[in-house]
Amino acid sequence: MRYIRIDKVEPGDILGKDIVDINGKVLLKASSDMTLSENIIAKIKERNIQGIYVDDEISKGINIEEAIPMTVRHMAIKALKKKDVQETEKIAEDIVNNFDGKVEIDLNRMMGDVSYFERAVNISELCLSLGKRLEFSDDSLSKLVASALLADIGLIMTEEEKKQILEKVPQDLREKILSLPNESASPILGKFVAAQNQADPMVIHSVYFHKENENGTGVIQNVYEQWGIQQKCDVRDTAKIIHICSDYIDALIRENDFTKARNMIEEGIVQGKYNYILASNFLRFIPMYPIGTLVQLSNGEIAAVVKNNDGFPLCPIVKLQTGEQLDLTKTLNVVIQDIYYSNKKGKQL
């Protein structure tokens, strides 16, 4: 199977995977005879679903699995919708315990997950993958995942919730916070939410500082300077990892392009935005071409990505239309030239 953006789906395509809404409800069940009609495609679009999985000859035998079980994902989304900090911390442990590190990250799906809640779970998945690569302990991974899930909780607070959270804050400080733009106020509000719900100190720190840059600039640093506070942000690795992963997901959603999202991280390293060691490790495991992606090879053939080679994001294992597989780390005279969908050339997926 392979993932296709909904605007690229055509009548006659076969649904390869159940279509599930944000609450875990199955909207359309996949089967070998589930051929999509114009009417069904229109109804899928009405649900604001960004893309689906289809089965076709070239992607036959390619299974795209979930690193985080869907049941656990939906539990996390439910807790976030309730803004339940303690429940989110518990679910973060479940995510770590149930995470399958052998399953490749499904960037195609992440590119279509545009809701705040899906985005938060996707960021936590990337953070967890990087944390495992860096050999974090399970306890540290749980705190990292909880921090990633809660990082932008300030963005979804109502005006009434903001006032309630800041109720015990001195009036002059409360007015300063409420007068800030949403992006600047969000980490401050998130810190108060986490602290007032007895979150782990590492979670509180990471929520507060996850928008700070390696070169000493950033959202909170700018607020400090604006308020005349002579203090430099001391940012820990958990917050730095969330910064990298959240920026990548945002670029992926905004650009609809794996290459542009990756280039944004590379440019950020050069500009001093991201920690070099953490960002470099991130780029080593993030694939340029996710499983199921159709690509055009330099020999003129079209192929589907079957598996990515760790450390070689430009050289996956691909399956030709003949069924033959090529490992591009070993077939040095063949490279990927472009991305295809439905045999139609297109950079934007």
Residue ranges and their predicted role:
Residues 41, 128, 186:
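Short glycine-/small-residue-rich flexible loop motifs, especially phosphate/cofactor-binding loops
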Residues 14-19, 100-107, 160-163, 239-243, ...:
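Short amphipathic alpha-helical segments, especially helix-boundary/capping motifs
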Residues 55-179, 196:
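Acidic/His-rich, divalent-metal-binding segments that scaffold phosphate/diphosphate chemistry
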Residues 1-90, 214-235, 254-349:
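Terminal helices and disordered tails flanking the catalytic cores of nucleotide-processing hydrolases
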Residues 123, 146-157, 169-280, 288, ...:
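Alpha-helical scaffolding flanking metal-ion-dependent phosphate/phosphodiester catalytic sites
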Residues 24, 128-132, 246-249:
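A broad detector of the eukaryotic-type serine/threonine protein kinase catalytic domain
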Residues 31, 113, 131, 251, ...:
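Short, flexible active-site loop motifs that bind/organize anionic cofactors or intermediates
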